Amino acid sequence: MKKQDLIDMEGIVTESLPNAMFRVCLDNGCQVLTHISGKIRRNYIRILPGDRVRVELSPYDLTKGRIIYRLRNKYPNGISQEVFRSMRD
């Protein structure tokens, strides 16, 4: 599959699962099961619930994806977790 066939979306990590898997809530409201790309794994980038990430989806299966980038936090320390918790409730 070519790189241009993939769909890029942004979302928030809602849950950390075993084996470096994460559940991500996309901006359109869909829940996606994702894993970490090789570059993130090699560079030891830590991804936690509440982090904003860029996800790459295959057009063949829109329920699974790959986290390709962790976006910078727009808020001061601690506020993003509060926003995340209020969003979940």
Curated annotation (Swiss-Prot):
It comes from the Eukaryota. It is found in: Plastid, Chloroplast. The keyword rRNA-binding applies. The keyword Protein biosynthesis applies. Belongs to the IF-1 family. One of the essential components for the initiation of protein synthesis. Stabilizes the binding of IF-2 and IF-3 on the 30S subunit to which N-formylmethionyl-tRNA(fMet) subsequently binds. Helps modulate mRNA selection, yielding the 30S pre-initiation complex (PIC). Upon addition of the 50S ribosomal subunit IF-1, IF-2 and IF-3 are released leaving the mature 70S translation initiation complex. NCBIfam families: infA. Component of the 30S ribosomal translation pre-initiation complex which assembles on the 30S ribosome in the order IF-2 and IF-3, IF-1 and N-formylmethionyl-tRNA(fMet); mRNA recruitment can occur at any time during PIC assembly. This is Translation initiation factor IF-1, chloroplastic. It comes from Angiopteris evecta (Mule's foot fern).
